[in-house]
Structures are given as C-alpha cells and as structure tokens.
Amino acid sequence: MQRLFDRLTGGRGYAPYPFQEKVADTILKGKNLFLCAPTGSGKTWAALLPFLSARQTGQLLADRLIYVLPLRALATSLYKETIKACSNVFKVKLQPEDRTREKDEIVITIQTGEQKNDPFFEGDIIFTTVDQCLSSYLNMPVSLPGRVGNINGGALLGSLVVLDEFHLLDPDRSMKTAMEMLSRLRPFANFIIMTATLAAKSMDMMQEILGGEIIRLSDEEVLALPSHSEKRRAYRWIDKPICTDDIVRSHNHGRTIVIVNTVDRAQQLYLTLRQEFRKKDKGAEVLLLHSRFYPADRKKTEDVLMDWFGKDARNTNAVLITTQVIEAGMDISADNLHTELAPLNSIIQRAGRCARYAGARGTGTVWIYELEQDENGRSRLGPYRDQSEVINDTRKALAKLNPAGEILGFYAELDLIDRVHTEQESAYLARYDQDLFSLKQKILAAMDGRNQTAVRELIRDVASVNVIISDQPEMLRFDREKWPQMLPVPRSSLYKLKSYLSGGIIDDTRVAAIPDETGDESDLRFTWSWPTDIDQLVKASWLVVIHPDYAGYSAELGLQLGVPGASREPGYFQRPLIPRYTIRYETYGEHVRRVMDAAREMQGFNRCASEKLAACYDLDSGRIEKLVEIACALHDVGKLSVKWQNGIREWQEYKDPAKLTHEPLAHSDYDPEKDWREKQPSRGNHAVESGYAVSQWLFDNLDNEMVAAVIYTAIARHHGAFSKSLSDFQLIDDAATWAGLENPPFIQGKISLLDRPQPTDRLEFADDYLLNFERDEEWWPLYAFIVRRLRLADQKSQKGDARYED
C-alpha cells in the first residue's frame, strides 16, 4: 500500500496518513464506512487507495468506483488530479471505448451536466455528481433522453460508491434519497460517506440506519497534518452586504476570493469589481468562475486560477469572483476570502479555500457578510430559500465571534457546526424512518416512470435542465455524429423568462422550446413545442432551447438569462452524447450472436455484481450470467414479425439489394449522416413485442416466475425505460426456427413463441405481467443488472465496438 501511494504521488517518498491506511483496511475487508476529516486532509486518496490497491493486486473488491460529488467543479478538479496521479502507475484511458484490456489499464471518466464523457457509467473510476447518480438510480438520469433511463441504475450494483461532502446534500431531498439508495444497495455494493462538517450526532444516527464503521480523526491526527499544524484562519462577521470597497481595501495586492450565492450576483459583482480595480489597481487580475460557462471557456479560467491560487502558485494580486462551484474540493487558496452568508456547514467548506496550505499561506481571514434584502426587506436567500432557520442560526452563531476576528481550528469549527446544524439534521434523520414508506413509494413510482417530478421531489428542487441558445431548434441535429453543447442551469433560473411567456408570443418571437422525442436511439428525432406557461417550461424533461432575444452568452460572463444575445451557431461536442454509428446490414442470427458475444466480453467487468446478486437471490454467479445470455438471445424476437421484415427488406432493397438472402434481417444498411432525412418504410415496434413473444416460454422453462418476469421486462424495455404498450403483431411462419438457431447451448429444444395478442392480452401484459416496482420491489436489482447488460451489449454488438441501438 505504501509503495503504491508513493508511486501515485510521484515517487517523492510520501506515505499515506494513518487514517488513510485505516480507511483502506476497512474497505478492503468489505465494510462500509463514514469518514469525518477536515478539508485538505486527503479524504479523496483515502477513498481511492483501496480500490486502486485491489486493482493492482487482483483482489475482487468492486467492479467500479463511482465517486459522487455535490458540485460539478469539484468533480472536474478531482478527475484531473486522479488522472495525473494514476498515470504514474497505470495505463490510463479516458473513454470506455478506448479500453484494450491491457494489464494495469484503468479507465477514468467523468459524467456531469457539463462534461458528458461517460453517459452510461462504464469507466473503472467514474467521477459524477449527486444529481447524475441519484437520478440514474431513479431511472430518470438528468442530461440524458428518457429512453435510455434504465441503463445506469445497474452500474451501482457491484460498485464502491463514494459520497463526498455528504453534508452539502439537501437533507429533506437528496440526503434522504441517497440513504434509501444505499440501504437498498447494501447487499449489492459498498459505500463510503465522507464529510468535513456533518454534525457528530447526525453521523451517529446515519450509522444506526445504514450500518458501517465511523472513522474520526483525533486532535493529534489533525495537528499532524501539514496543512493544519500551523494554520491560523480567522473568521469575521460583517453585519452588512458585501461591497466592493471592503474587498479592495483588504486585498493589498494579495490573493482574494469572493463567493456569492447566485450566478447573477457573481456576474454583477465581477463587472463592478473589474471597473473598480481598473481605477485603483490596474495590475490586479480579476477573474470570474461559475457553473454557466461552456467547458472550453471554463477550462481556460480554471487553468489560469492555478497560476494565481494553486498550491505552487507564485503570482499574487488576483481576485476571483465565484459561487458555490469552488465550495468544496477545489485545491486553491486565498489570503482573504469574502463570502455571503450561507448555512454554516457551507461557510466552513468555503473557508477551506482560505489559508489552505502550510507555511506562509496557512494564515488568512474569512469575511462573512449579511445577505442583501429585497424591496420588502426580506433577505435574498437564493439557493437557501428552504433553509431560512439554518441561515438565522448561522447568523446568530457568527455574530458571537470576536468582531476583530476569531481563529478557529478543525474541532472548534465542528463544535460551531454541532450547535447550528445538529437540531435540524437530527430532526430530518429522525423523520427518515417515519417517512420511509412514502419515500419508497415516490422512488418506486419514478423507477416505473410514474413520477415525472421525482427529480425535484427526491433530489433537489433546483435540479438542472440543459439549455441551448438558438432561434431554430428544428435545425439542431441530435441524430448526427455530433451532439450540441448545452449548459445545465437550475430550473428555478428559468423563472427569469416568466414575464416574456405570460403573453405566449411577443412580437411574433417565440421565447423557448422543449422537445418531444420520437424514434429509437439510433434515429432519435424531436418535434418542438413552444410553451406559453412558465410551469410547462420549468418541468421540461431535460432540455430547453431559448431564443437569443431572451438569453445571451459570452466567454467572459457566461450564460445570462433574460438578457438578449446575438444569435450564434450552437457548438457541438466532438462525439455525441449517445454515440451513433453507421449501421450495417445484419441478419437476425448474426445480430443475436454478436450481442451475446458482447455480453460475454463484459462479464469480467461485472463479476462483483454477479456474485452479490447470486448470493441475494440464492443462485450461483454462473446462473446470473446465463440469465443475461437468455435475455440477449431472445431480445429481438419481435423483429421476426411480418411487418418488421417487410419494412426492413424494402429499405435494404433501396440501399443495396445484392446483400439480401432468404434469412430474416435484424438491421439494414443505414448511414446517419446521409439517410436521416429519408423516410423509411414503417416496420412497427419490436421491443415490447419481443418480451411478450417469449414470456410463456420463459415461464415454462425457468424455475422461478419472477425471474422470467425480470427477463421479459428487460427485453420489453431494451429501447425505452418505461415501454409497456404492446401492439398487434404476427410472426413470420418459421420464426421459432430462426429464434432458436443462435441460442446458447444450455437452452434445449424449440423456442415456443406467442403472437397476435388480443386486446385483453395487450392490456393484461402491460398492467399485470411487466414488472411494477411498487409491487415487485425486491426484483429491481436483478432487473437493473440484466437490462443494463442487454442494452450495452446491444450497443456494442457490431464489429469494432461500433455503438448503435435499433
């Protein structure tokens, strides 16, 4: 372990701290863990080290590590640091499709609303956000079209899930949902919950609910940390809102960070401070960073930041105006940190960006200012509008500090946090058991597609939606090889457009459009509607396209809503959110064989999940893999319908008739760059029909009817997370023969198939036969695993790991 740590940290003779070794030992023993340690102490390496050690030694600890963070900026920062460190030991790849299975290879990815590099959580180490993780658990992943919503939940099984900065979760929404998720996953995954500022009583209560061990650093361990041994960080309460004069006066050509609670406030303050420093200190570098920059523009600022505020920075005389995006984990430090009032645990997190390093940079001042007031004399709470009591308690606690500044060490900070947060956190946690039935009902309804407001109810009310600025949404192409760049914004920020929407259309200009999805993933198309009501806009599933008369963007200020901007061609990612490739002619038998081969190739990346599922359902792990193979072998039986075969053969006649044989087809030639405008012959649906066709055979040949239901539900939903509508269809005469040709050897005999369902059969299959998780809750883990394996195998099944779905 020590040698691995030394190599990860550049071979400079560093050894892990005792608490990091204790964390690693606990996790390697298969236990769950709560870790309380100060900012800058090395919590991240405490979580990563056991996973990397297991990978290096071949120990089966977890199939992947999912590192979950409350903020996108923090995910990006840790992602970059981990790549740099792991490159000293491993062969690092950054995309799942670049995997070569070499020895010591590790795939490190990031999936946030801003950086969508791993939409299906296929990396070995995945950095993501709370929104992404919890919404994936709910089968409603933010930033992804709803049709692919049931792929990511299965990635949680067999994983080591790290929830960092846990105290920053909304205690009445995301924290409760995360606890329910971890409770459900306990037989199937391991977890680490990490925090610097969660009240001690709250952590004890969570341990009672979830089990696991608690590791807290002693006073001696904290003082032994280089970043804390000589730290002198003073806190000062200022009973008035932030003003530019105070910032300029205390700056003194040093390093200053200003943190405010909203992007709008940051943009306004940046413009004012930039002007002020131009008058009084032309040499000062004034920077702006928040969540509404395109990745390239944001990266430029973050790179510049390290030169001024990073650990090895030599430059001084810089001012950064920012928001909560740097509240946790970003490795920068200032001499003076000015912040608007926020909940105390957030204040302490922000303070972690002041006097962060040893030596001369271990001294600094945190200035905390009163909030601005609205025209009615009420505090502008911004994102903390639901936490007014905590804000008031924080205000009272800070007002008792020495007006000249009071130096607080780690345990003095924790004592202050206990006084402010214990009562509310304890009340929320005490209600967890009382609210659990209602919470589960909402979660299970979301998993079934029956709770469209689940993200707002169960994660956070300001959950993000993607925004594009364009006056012609119909010209945006989502079915090409590029996917348009988007900016995630809190849904609440869309209320800036309310006055424009009240009349519906103003001066014949449409304000904002939302998409309605049609087609499968391989041919995803949108029709556009223009809401005239703000509630419609705020409830948009994942994307809003705003007319440039009502939104603007610049590399200096980022996205501004309610401010006109010039119309510009939307930027495109170099690879689409859901990759689409040219589809090749493929017979039914060839396709089934390739899907099964792809599933077998993924088996090694799912060993831990298979073993844990087998233990839970009293099966052997080999049986779990056989269930995956059965799903893959039978998933496209619905394509053996008369309508499907007539339609696909007609299209192939148009593309290249010389390829046609007597065999039924699974795919025809299709080039998304050339053929997307062409109207193809109707083939009807096939996914739910496939599930129905094989359902009776599964009942007859598996010894558990619920396992049969898991498989045919996964088949029915291998193109849509909530598909349930069964159409009338008739199979070709020799469908059973073709369906049995490529089956794995353990499937003996002829496959009997159903078709031509009566209207009552169609209703009964949708309502009674397909899994309903409110009724069939205990089978969600097995379903989530099998449907994920099936859909990913279906994507990867063409030569060269070309991805497609049809």
Regions found by a protein language model. Give the residues of each.
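Conserved Walker A/P-loop ATP-binding site and its immediately adjacent core
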Residues: 44-45, 61-86, 198-202, 263
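Conserved strand-helix element at the start of the C-terminal RecA-like helicase core
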Residues: 64-78, 250-274, 288
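Inter-Walker segment of RecA-like/P-loop motor cores
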Residues: 86-142
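SF2 helicase catalytic motif II
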Residues: 133-186
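Interdomain hinge/linker at the junction between the two RecA-like core domains of SF2 helicases
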Residues: 198-252
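Divalent metal-dependent catalytic cores for phosphoryl transfer on phosphate-bearing substrates
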Residues: 385-401, 616-806
